Amino acid sequence: MSESLDNSAINQLIPEIFDQMRHNAARTRDAKKPSAMVEESGSITTQSLLRELETLDKVIATIRSIDSVVKGALPSHMNKIHHVCKSTNKMLDNWINIQSQAGYAHHIMDSRTGSKTGSNSNEEVVEQYKQEIAELQKSIKMEEDKLIPAQVKGNGNGPTGQRLYGNSYRQPTGRVTKATALRNARNRPSGIPQISSRLTRPTASSNLKRQR
């Protein structure tokens, strides 16, 4: 097979591959679109294929240059050959990734999320998102306000801010016991000296001794 036949086969095969990729990505989407939108999408696909063909021509030229370098390389140039092959594989992987992401981006732009804003400007789109964020923040604030009374009730806080420790808590009363009154009297400072010995009444014999 000659080189011209190989190039013609590649030029016919590559557009078919990309067209099939986009057809698979947009199969479910195109069924719901009107005919005018389908025709517009087809024209966009044709333009993108032409751009891809130009880029592929540059890639093919690069591959040919690499092939000529490898053919004239010596065994001592194996490290360079390995580096060239690794770079070429990375370039091809990135190219495939670009094509996949392009189809995915095209799908997102035509999805309901992408067409939600319609023909609105960027400022209107940003304003709509700000309103949605404000509504979400308002809903979160309302939910937090509902949770605060439930937490206060669960902690057992009374209306006066005092915590009730079960049934063991008792309100203080105005009654004072005898032991408390005696303790307070002992602790109260006074000028009367305290006598540690016990006071007893004098007996009749002690009175007679004093009279003598």
Curated annotation (Swiss-Prot):
Domain of life, per lineage: Eukaryota
Compartments it resides in: Nucleus; Cytoplasm, Cytoskeleton, Spindle pole; Chromosome, Centromere, Kinetochore
Record-linked PANTHER family: DASH COMPLEX SUBUNIT DUO1
Keyword Cell division: yes
Keywords: Cell cycle, Cell division, Centromere, Chromosome, Chromosome partition, Coiled coil, Cytoplasm, Cytoskeleton, Kinetochore, Microtubule, Mitosis, Nucleus
Matches recorded under InterPro entries: DASH_Duo1 (IPR013960)
UniProt main location, coarse: nucleus
Assembly description: Component of the DASH complex consisting of ASK1, DAD1, DAD2, DAD3, DAD4, DAM1, DUO1, HSK3, SPC19 and SPC34, with a stoichiometry of one copy of each subunit per complex. Multiple DASH complexes oligomerize to form a ring that encircles spindle microtubules and organizes the rod-like NDC80 complexes of the outer kinetochore. DASH complex oligomerization strengthens microtubule attachments. On cytoplasmic microtubules, DASH complexes appear to form patches instead of rings. Within the complex, DAM1 and DUO1 may form the microtubule connections.
Gene Ontology biological process terms in this record: attachment of spindle microtubules to kinetochore; cell division; mitotic sister chromatid biorientation; positive regulation of attachment of spindle microtubules to kinetochore; positive regulation of microtubule polymerization; protein transport along microtubule to mitotic spindle pole body
Cellular-component GO terms for this entry: cytoplasm; DASH complex; microtubule; mitotic spindle; spindle pole
Pfam families: DASH_Duo1
Protein name per Swiss-Prot or TrEMBL: DASH complex subunit DUO1
Family named by the database record: Belongs to the DASH complex DUO1 family.
Chain's role: Component of the DASH complex that connects microtubules with kinetochores and couples microtubule depolymerisation to chromosome movement; it is involved in retrieving kinetochores to the spindle poles before their re-orientation on the spindle in early mitosis and allows microtubule depolymerization to pull chromosomes apart and resist detachment during anaphase.
One GO molecular-function entry: microtubule plus-end binding
Source organism (scientific name): Candida glabrata (strain ATCC 2001 / BCRC 20586 / JCM 3761 / NBRC 0622 / NRRL Y-65 / CBS 138) (Yeast)
Chain intervals with Polar residues compositional bias: 193-212
Coiled coil: 118-148
Region entry Disordered, spans: 150-212
